[in-house]
């Protein structure tokens, strides 16, 4: 019968600062729960002060000869850190690149529908790549495609900026707009 590998593995070290008995220094610089510096003292005295306040002793700065420790509620600290990370993650919305495909001889109503879709993408904070595809003899009238992309650029000049100017790649013309 095979043994489970985690049975003989050492216990996992928790990430984050050392707290209470995990602190390894003999003398520490103590900062109390009010943020006032209490001075250098033995670790045992600092632990007693933390227990007296019914809080934890947390190692704030471990790099020095006498590490800086602070008396605070570690559970509350972790909760607030998690909350900050979640808020930062929520704020950091990644901008997607949405694509709108059109043809050079697009009808007015079809253009309006595409324009509404582009406006919605800008409201959501997404970039828009407009792809204008030419077929057959339409390649002879590339100026019509350029005029159409210029019209799109003019229609959205208040809400978007041109990130990539219109350019011809094979049988299609592309332009990228980003929200302002």
Swiss-Prot record:
Entry's localization field: Cytoplasm
Statement: the UniProt record of this protein carries the keyword Membrane: no
Entry superkingdom: Bacteria
Keywords of the record: Cytoplasm, Initiation factor, Protein biosynthesis
Pfam families per the UniProt record, alphabetical: IF3_C, IF3_N
Gene3D superfamilies: Translation initiation factor 3 (IF-3), C-terminal domain, Translation initiation factor 3 (IF-3), N-terminal domain
One Gene Ontology MF term: translation initiation factor activity
GO CC field: cytosol; membrane
Record flagged with keyword Protein biosynthesis: yes
Alphabetical GO biological process terms: ribosome disassembly
Known role: IF-3 binds to the 30S ribosomal subunit and shifts the equilibrium between 70S ribosomes and their 50S and 30S subunits in favor of the free subunits, thus enhancing the availability of 30S subunits on which protein synthesis initiation begins.
Family, per entry: Belongs to the IF-3 family.
Subunit field text: Monomer.
Protein name, per record: Translation initiation factor IF-3
Origin species: Hyphomonas neptunium (strain ATCC 15444)
